[in-house]
Amino acid sequence: MKKTNPKATKTVYPIICQIVNVIPHQFIAEAAKAHKVLSRTFTPKSHVAAMLYCQVSKTESLNSICDVAAANEALWTSMGVTVPRRNTFSNANAMRPSAMAKDLYWRTYNYLIGIAPDFGRRAHRGYCSRVKAPMFAVDSSTIKLTMNSFDWARHRREKAAAKLHMTLDLGNRLPSFAVVEDAAHHDSVRAAELTAHLRRGDIAVADRAYTDFGFMNGLDARGVWFVTRQKRNMKMEVVRRLMEPAAATGERKTQILADEIVVPAKKSTAAKYAGTLRRVTAVVEVQGQMKTMMFLTNNLKWSARTVAEIYRDRWGIETFFKELKQTCQIHDFIGYSENAVQWQVWIGLLAHLILRYLRYLSKWGLSFSRLAALVRGTLWNRRRLIETLRLYGTASPVKSPARKPKPLYFQAVFDFPSAAVGQQTP
């Protein structure tokens, strides 16, 4: 079947409008009312639309957003919003509570999960499918800022940064909880808050920054399984060996070196975690290199290889952070206050969620960065977005029809002799 490029038509809204319309209109009004956002001309919907355009187009300044909106005023106002003015837009980012953007994100998240259950249940390639319990990765990502402009985010003598703490559902690779704040606090400070919503039987996976005996004891008391890495300075006493120690073979696959039951060796740490832990030592591949790692868990029934593979799935949250920063505007900020930064990060998460949902609807088969680039390049086109994504994302490149060789008219007109130069033809 021949695929044709979807034609532009006046009856279809521009693609930026179709992206904004993924969010039910009443959600913006309800979130604004819940957080007492007052407005006259620059409505909350106008604010959200401008911020979504900033994220999807990766625009770096307020002036650029306002200029593009003014240049495309007829298309911009077709969304039912007003063209932003620089000062009004800047004041909205600084004064309107960022809790509205956070609230809007979770309203939209729950709505999309509700209307498309498969979108919320989809497991990615490499997921440890033999583990049926829900798995959640806990981690944070640092967002570098300029100390001269973002003095509220100063956390070292000459550095400033914000931090995005997150609990990611490893099944669908979508956030289940997130916190945006300055980077002055250690990751472990937010550990209990990030895992408060986990239920009995869920699995929490975290790196060494969250390895704390008090935190692990709280998870164990609630019936939550955990897999984390042992810190280098942790002193553990071996109670029982579940397998004899082995040596690494040099093969490029997960190798189990030791499987032990351990307890904290110091009295001070033993008071924080009174139970026993299981320590699995394995050689795993990290960024193309084989490394030896020690994992701690409170589950004694899983196989040692399953423990290592569960921790391997934790790297899905690293992929999420990389994907978010590559496709959304999380590097350059259009506002300097803490509230403005939080607005931009939460709308960045919202834009990422919408793009992920569009990828699900269109059955996009290429990389996520290519989808974001295609959407970015067609924001003002009047084309049906899903049809456009299906054309470019699911099919192999269309082969051009084979061309018939053209007749050699030059040779037909002039009958060249076949004999060599200087010879006479018979």
Feature annotation, model-predicted:
Residues T77-S78, R122-G126, W152-R156, F215:
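Catalytic micro-motifs at enzyme active sites that drive phosphoryl/nucleotidyl and oxygen chemistry
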Residues M100-A116:
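Short Lys/Arg-enriched helix C-cap and helix-to-coil transition segments
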Residues M1-S64, V68, R96, D103-R107, ...:
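Single, function-defining residue in the core of a domain
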Residues I113-S129, L145:
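Long amphipathic N-terminal alpha/beta scaffold segment
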Residues S78-R96:
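Major-groove recognition helix of helix-turn-helix-like DNA-binding domains
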Residues A74-L75, D118-R121, N148-R154, H185, ...:
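Short acidic (Asp/Glu) patches
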Residues A70-M79:
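Extended, structured, electrostatic nucleic-acid-contact surfaces
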